[in-house]
Curated annotation (Swiss-Prot):
The name this protein goes by in its record: Cytochrome c oxidase assembly protein CtaG
Chief location category: membrane
Example GO BP: respiratory chain complex IV assembly
Organism of derivation: Mesorhizobium japonicum (strain LMG 29417 / CECT 9101 / MAFF 303099)
Role summary: Exerts its effect at some terminal stage of cytochrome c oxidase synthesis, probably by being involved in the insertion of the copper B into subunit I.
Keywords annotated in UniProt: Cell inner membrane, Cell membrane, Copper, Membrane, Signal-anchor, Transmembrane, Transmembrane helix
Length: 206
């Protein structure tokens, strides 16, 4: 009875291990983006703000802080800007700011906003109660919509050594185009599977 060379069996085992390794690496790469996003939202890492259920901090400090507002677009054919450039409020005080968006394209366009704050360490202490960034927004050609954000700065921010002397926080949004499975021509939040589209597709109307 003939025996298969041990070298061939060894090579097959090595090949199988390598294939499993590379397959696992590809899977981890695809999972990394949503996992990183979840991590940022849970911890405030990278300046990601927090979404909270309670509308009030529970206490308001006798100390003011200024929030500056920034707006950017990335391939979406909109005008997008804050209504106010800055607001000064008490730490722990719930306030509402407004952004405004206008669709400059000749077709309905859906946008999605990403956000962060500077300094990044302030992310876990910048609490949003309501925000247009929680859902996608669709605008008809030429339509303008008011986009409110209700928030407060957590009083615990003064207990962080690196933030105890911070007097200004910048809240920044970047608006991206979104392609829907079915065109929607409404400023109401829409449901359904969506994906971010490229600048070229946005310029062509999706």
């Amino acid at each position: 009875m003939s025996k298969k060379p041990a070298g061939k069996n060894s090579n097959r085992i090595v090949a199988a291990v390598c294939l499993a390794f590379f397959t696992g690496m590809i899977g981890m790469a695809y999972a990394a983006v949503p996992l990183y996003k979840m991590f940022c939202q849970a911890t405030g890492y990278g300046g990601t703000t927090q979404r909270v259920e309670k509308q009030y901090a529970g206490r308001v400090l006798d100390r003011e802080i200024t929030v500056r507002f920034d707006a950017n677009i990335a391939g979406v054919p909109w005008e997008f800007q804050p209504v106010q450039r800055s607001m000064t409020m008490k730490i722990g005080e719930t306030v509402q700011a407004h952004y405004q968006a206008t669709n400059k394209f000749d077709r309905p366009v859906t946008g999605r906003a990403t956000f962060n704050v500077q300094p990044e360490l302030a992310g876990p202490y910048f609490n949003k109660v309501e925000c247009f960034c929680f859902t996608d927004t669709s605008l008809k050609p030429g339509e303008t919509v008011d986009m409110p954000v209700l928030f407060y700065v957590d009083p615990d921010i003064v207990n962080v050594p690196e933030l105890k002397d911070v007097k200004t926080i910048t809240l920044s949004y970047t608006m991206f185009p979104v392609e829907k499975n079915k065109p929607v021509a409404s400023s109401e939040p829409v449901q359904g599977t969506s994906k971010i589209i490229s600048d070229t597709e946005a310029n062509l109307g999706g």
